[in-house]
Amino acid sequence: MSKTLKIIQKKKSLEKELYTRKKKLKKLKKLGFNFPNTFHYIHTIKEIKKLYNNYTKKELEKINYKTKISGRIVNKRTFGKALFFVIRNNNHDIQIYIKSNYFPKNYYQKNILELDLGDIIGVKGKIFKTNTCELSILCKKIYLLTKSLRSLPDKYFGLKNQEIKYRKRYLDLISNNKIIKIFQKRSLIISNIRSFMKQKKFLEVETPMLHPIPGGANAKPFITYHNSLNEKMYLRIAPELYLKKLIIGGFNKIFEINRNFRNEGISTKHNPEFTMMEIYMSYSNYIDIMNLLEELCIFLVKKISKSLIIMYKSKKINFKKPIKKMTMIESILKFNKNIDISNFKNIKNIKKTATNLNIKIDSNASLGEITNLIFEKTTEKKIIQPTFITEYPIEISPLAKEKNKYFAERFEFFIAGYEIANGFSELNDPEEQKKRFKLQISKKNYTDKSKNFSYDKDYIIALEHGLPPTSGLGVGIDRLIMILTNQKTIKDIIFFPLLKKI
């Protein structure tokens, strides 16, 4: 049978199933069924297993404990005059044992036997163990709470099509306990991040998602329009400038965990809508915030894996303290034996090196910009173990304090070939910041003459009131979770990743 024919037959089968179930619902509604919401469970399935799993069959018979539970039917089988359901609730399953002679014959045949996979039910009954010692519920009463009109994915094989998993995440969650555990772990990681920040006396804040000027990072914004104000607005690329205004206002230690939006490509490590944490700490520098990040990562790894070693894509990732530190140029030389330190001496040498490596560069690119391009193209993916890369060129660090005329007090943090975080000592000289903004804008306007770029002048005014010595850090929460949960793509740790319309 051809693949196309199989798809057609499958579609017809699903349409027939939908029709049959709609007929059942129509009959139920005539009998007064209205998707009731008055059933309340006494225990969750997880609670029942925790409380009674260690009891023997005889002990449970002696206790004779009754309960009420609810869940979705995910398995159904008959055995003689008995019927067995497996119901699922919040990633936990339990067997329901239904004896036909406990119910009027007509009710059993027309109501209980007619229940389908996917239906959501409430059950009142006694907790017991079968002869094979499986914890179960002996059903005394059963309540249909929600009629499922569409059939569920196959119990054993689940969803095979990866794109359907992303487009119809609810089906993936129903049929795949593993994916539920990943998202539960995501929630746990974010909770632990908040707990850590609270321990360190940081205040969680919220800043605007709609910005009048696109700023905070060098990326394309999503553009929208505010009807009442009659103004173009931008979904935030980064909250950086607003957060630093709060530091100017007097807060010492703040952080924000929220969404950023960048109107750019989609890949295994990029989603246009993503979760970031930004941290700002006054009276500190980039070394201080680097140490804070090291402490946070070790804290999270211990919480998740109970050790300092995790597996990612079959590689052991070791978070042993101290985490390795290298300058950008040191890392390029380490991972590319064909490149020599002399290549970075002047613009002529660096351009020749880039050409030899087939790296496209702009004719006006500076020494630092080309060095960064070489790093991105030849080195990033090779940094597997947790590593802080320092001494970023000043030309690509417009908001960072200078270390010297070549480098900024800046670092990026890499794990498994992914950039996880970016931190630096904040530039707090308003005149220098204004100068850098203007240079950045002139480059943008030169590159794209169709647009008239501008910068946040209010931020400069705020700086003129005085920003204390401050360090800042941005952490890509999604990428960090990818690594801590051993997932190959960012789509696997976002409930509803952005996909093209079909």
Swiss-Prot record:
**What do the Gene Ontology cellular component annotations say?**
cytosol
MF terms (GO), sorted A to Z: ATP binding; lysine-tRNA ligase activity; magnesium ion binding; tRNA binding
Q: What is its main location?
A: cytoplasm
Q: Which reaction does it catalyse?
A: tRNA(Lys) + L-lysine + ATP = L-lysyl-tRNA(Lys) + AMP + diphosphate
Note how many cofactor molecules are bound and how: Binds 3 Mg(2+) ions per subunit.
- Listed CDD domains: LysRS_core (cd00775), LysRS_N (cd04322)
Q: Which major enzyme category is it?
A: ligase
Q: Give me the residues that bind Mg(2+) 2, please.
A: 419
A Pfam family: tRNA_anti-codon
Under the heading PROSITE patterns, the entry gives: AA_TRNA_LIGASE_II
Annotated binding of Mg(2+) 1, by residue: 412, 419
What this protein needs as a cofactor is: Mg(2+)
What domain of life? Bacteria
UniProtKB keywords: Aminoacyl-tRNA synthetase, ATP-binding, Cytoplasm, Ligase, Magnesium, Metal-binding, Nucleotide-binding, Protein biosynthesis
Q: Which PANTHER family match?
A: LYSINE--TRNA LIGASE, CHLOROPLASTIC_MITOCHONDRIAL, LYSYL-TRNA SYNTHETASE
Record's subunit section: Homodimer.
Instruction: List the protein's name.
Output: Lysine--tRNA ligase
Q: Which gene encodes it?
A: lysS
